[in-house]
């Protein structure tokens, strides 16, 4: 980050924009109350948090920068200061422009006007300590010095000021040259012009020190002349900052992590040139979006990318039924276990214990079936697992929009399912800072530059990301210069954002029956829409150079409460919407953000590119220099009507429905569900399908979960996870399927580039991507098109 700041300094990427190069001097020394009230009347409107809705959640803290007061001044001060930004929300790489207004109630000498754009990271230490303390680090800083001569007068404010002396009614303009009049000058160019006009001589040196000394002497000489003494009035200084393209977005995870940006302005002034210097400081907060506009436009045109997940569960009959029935069955099992301990020769009671054996299929007695009267359980319950396939239509979701799920449920045992539970979680992973002992033992000199401790810039380069994965999440390892055993562990904080239970009796009203060679299977399908609340933040978090390295992830968990351990985790990439036309809507009317409604689907692209119903009149946030929205609208008009109609028909059905007035949602056509194969009937098979040995009392039958064939113990002794089928636990497969696993792993890690010709086909189902692990998608932080 230090290198980035130096590059900005050398390239003069922080220009100052000046509209007029003259100073108006007006003699006003009395009646300071009227200018003060007028100065307060032009204060900008109070800014709101861009992602928090005050109508749905408790009010958030006023600002994430509460530790830094926005004004350091006293009442009745001679010099008052105010910062007015053109707007409050910016994107990476954008120019921040605004004005600094200085109110002088008496004649003063302004010596320096300094601006500083700073980025802060507030990290809470509750993961390390019992109390909820925090540390604040400054990870970005950009400075800009404005010469006092670069002023643009607000004539409307000066005309209303009282004038004590009638002889000074006309303003006095400072003499300026033709080259500097009404032009935009940098502070260096203005200083050189002033140096050429000054009558004083400077000491001549060689090299760079000559120019530096001449500039400093010219500034010091100009400060000693009466030209820098300003009369009472309101003085306006325009400025502009150029943001870098890789800044962390503004966020406020309350109680965990906060990133905020402030524009500080400090003015040094005095009564005279030899009087004691005084200073006044004022700050203004702004919000920066981490989403690149090009990538956001890219998402608008590529919204049809979906992600699908599948879960298969080999059920145990003890987990079926209601709570009462399950308790009765557990009591019966406990009684049977006690009888087994007392009577070792009682074979009838041992039948229940054999049902828990996962290595081979078993049958259920009539007594056990009677304990679950509400559920029809077949004898081959192990060969008919319950399966659920879920398709998330859009992997990239926006805050305030709806996430659409398509669900297909295969229930061969006709289990009674009353509801489906949908949960949204936010997971924040932290890296602990080094302890004081470790920090002082290595690189003690570098720690002095850190604000409040933490990891220095020289140590950040030693942080390496491990390729290994643990529980689906990445781990970051810190390697110390002196010891490789000092590795910081990841601290994870998981918060539940929303919880909804949907009634399945209405959702699964329409059931489709798929016929096969042996039997008919019932397949239930439905769709759900979940509105992502505004109280959540996006997951586009950038690692900073101070404090912790943090990652934020969001995921859905869809489960069936009546079935234990039947949960499916679906990761989602969450984005904050920052359209050019919606800056005012986001800040002033949060609940009017554009999102899908249940009764108005229509054109998908238009619903995502609309500017909302909020009006942007009378607000400074409506100004924008971007043309990406105009480009998006032009591209939208050029789309072919036939392609647009085909795009809409892919997900929506316009057929009339008396029971439902809204449009029907259709799953993507590319979504193909790979269900588990049907087990072969072992009663009609006497030999192993691979070695052709005859089954006996010792050589028992086993089924392959990947192909459904019947094999002996020697030909089906391998166990793997069938991720393509949704089986996350290791199950038994045959040797032929195991060879396909090895062939797939040798070609590709995720199995995406494997040749399907080398994989066997069994029961008409290819085994491609069956054993491959689900790919973990990571949202790109910045995409160059």
UniProtKB/Swiss-Prot annotation:
Zn(2+) 1 binds at residues 688, 691, 712, 715. Residues 466-478 have a biased composition (Basic residues). Gene3D superfamilies: 2.60.40.640, Zinc/RING finger domain, C3HC4 (zinc finger). A zinc finger (FYVE-type) spans 682-742. Residues 29-69, 172-205, 326-367, 435-486, 608-642 are annotated as: Disordered. A zinc finger (RING-type) spans 688-738. GO terms for molecular function: zinc ion binding. It comes from the Eukaryota. Residues 173-205, 435-450, 608-633 have a biased composition (Low complexity). Keywords: Metal-binding, Zinc, Zinc-finger. SUPFAM superfamilies: E set domains (SSF81296), FYVE/PHD zinc finger (SSF57903). The keyword Transferase does not apply. Zn(2+) 2 binds at residues 704, 707, 734, 737. InterPro entries: Arrestin-like_C (IPR014752), Arrestin-like_N (IPR011021), FYVE-type_Zinc_Finger (IPR052113), Ig_E-set (IPR014756), Znf_FYVE (IPR000306), Znf_FYVE-rel (IPR017455), Znf_FYVE_PHD (IPR011011), Znf_RING/FYVE/PHD (IPR013083). Belongs to the arrestin family. This is Arrestin domain-containing protein D. It comes from Dictyostelium discoideum (Social amoeba).
